[in-house]
Amino acid sequence: MELGDTTSVIPDSFMGYRDDITMQMSMVLDQIRAPLIVPALRLGVYICLTMSVMLFVERVYMGIVISLVKLFGRKPDKRFKYEPIKDDIELGNSAYPMVLIQIPMFNEREVYQLSIGAACGLSWPSDRIVIQVLDDSTDPTIKDLVEMECSRWASKGVNIKYEIRDNRNGYKAGALKEGMKKSYVKSCDYVAIFDADFQPEADFLWRTVPYLLHNPKLALVQARWKFVNSDECLMTRMQEMSLDYHFTVEQEVGSSTYAFFGFNGTAGIWRISALNEAGGWKDRTTVEDMDLAVRASLKGWKFLYLGSLKVKNELPSTFKAYRYQQHRWSCGPANLFRKMAFEIMTNKNVTLWKKVHVIYSFFVVRKLVAHIVTFIFYCVILPATVLVPEVTVPKWGAVYIPSVITLLNAVGTPRSLHLMVFWILFENVMSLHRTKATFIGLLEGGRVNEWIVTEKLGDVKAKSATKTSKKVIRFRFGDRIHVLELGVGMYLLFVGCYDAFFGKNHYYLYLFAQAIAFFIAGFGQIGTIVPNH
């Protein structure tokens, strides 16, 4: 027996048995290929192409609208009355409306001082503003720190209230709802909301309140987010590109056309009477902000987006935190659509076109189709056509439409144009979780109401770096393994290899790149990695 002849140690009966199984499996696949696999894949291609066209038309429509808005200079002060609030000698400070500032927080050790300090630094008559810190922290040390910070500002004459609850029912929505029940809130006209990592500039109220004061049908003024850590890592740059498009295009288009868009949950100021008329805060989904916005819109209230007003905040820089955030942002809207679709269709307070905009454009295309088609088409169906060459995808669906959509997205962040290829691959990876979360929301699955507060690092990374010489850093490798990403990566790698040897479409160039992106995410090598000491 030769040393390299491994087949000689395997019984002939086993080899024959293995060949029989392989032949039988091949025969079964051949038998079901034509009547089952090919038609099913063709149907999948047709559905995905339809969704791609829906998304393409929506993006082109928004591109046209935003171009017209810029061309004709439809600035906010041309659509809504704006006059600076003037001093009144007779009325004194009572001429200024009473404003409530709400800051909900949960174990925000790294950023609580930033948000509280920024809120206390807002320029407004001191007797016409109330700052309400809603602390749901479960860590007693952090609660003490937050309370001490509030006391420190109170000693300086700031009207600040520190509020806690004995439970976390309703999470953020529950905290905001409880805050609105306080007796001192009854005298307030407007409420501005800032999450714990948001830092408004001192003139925030001077630039927003006049719109609400002079336009009685205006319920909400939303500011834009400005990211202080967008250059921290490649993942934060990718987030910046997506969110810049959201604010620059989606929010602006909604504000300019139907005076409706989704409230971003922070960096906005509401008319309290409108908030109450809409039914107040509800915790039935994880997107209480969007829920409130839709209900207020159905009451006939209008919204205004101020793109020129920016509020600094922090992007999630760890992959774990970003995944949790994207689950909430994808699952919540799908679940809200399930709960409110009929209510929207039967509403009599808004026009038919606004109903179409809310149901079709806002929910179906942007919150459902955009997530599903990205993953199902580009990461499942398109690769599958490599293995089943009887099914083809037209070039306009595989190349032209996604290329145009990508270029339209680039208008939000011109400085990151050179990163578009990385952005595409990253968005496809994240579409896996968004698609899963979307179906959980639509079907009200087990994690439909999962609420995990997005982790903010603040300067924790810098602090960790200074301790490297004193302590040995250990990374728990197993905590960073993500099986779903690795599974999709293996599928794409296999299809890519098959296409490289037997295919004719040269999809393997894309498939290999996308597989690598899934592997990078699957092994947790993305975003900021916080060491465990």
Swiss-Prot record:
The active site is at D136, D289. GO terms for biological process: cell wall organization; DNA-mediated transformation; response to bacterium. It is found in: Golgi apparatus membrane. It is a multi-pass membrane protein. Pfam families: Glyco_trans_2_3 (PF13632). The chain crosses the membrane at residues 37-57, 368-388, 404-426, 483-503, 510-530. One of its GO terms (molecular function) is mannan synthase activity. Signal peptide: none annotated. Keywords: Cell wall biogenesis/degradation, Glycosyltransferase, Golgi apparatus, Membrane, Transferase, Transmembrane, Transmembrane helix. Its main location: Golgi. Its EC number is 2.4.1.32. Disruption phenotype: Plants develop approximately half the number of lateral roots without affecting significantly aerial parts development, and are resistant to A.tumefaciens transformation. It catalyses: GDP-mannose + (glucomannan)n = GDP + (glucomannan)n+1. GO terms for cellular component: Golgi membrane. Expressed in cotyledons at the base of the hypocotyls, in root elongation zone, lateral root primordia, vascular system of young leaves, abscission zone of the pedicle,. Possesses glucomannan synthase and mannan synthase activities in vitro. Mannan synthase consists of a 4-beta-mannosyltransferase activity on mannan using GDP-mannose. The beta-1,4-mannan product is the backbone for galactomannan synthesis by galactomannan galactosyltransferase. Galactomannan is a noncellulosic polysaccharides of plant cell wall. Required for lateral root development. Belongs to the glycosyltransferase 2 family. Plant cellulose synthase-like A subfamily. This is Glucomannan 4-beta-mannosyltransferase 9. The gene is CSLA9.
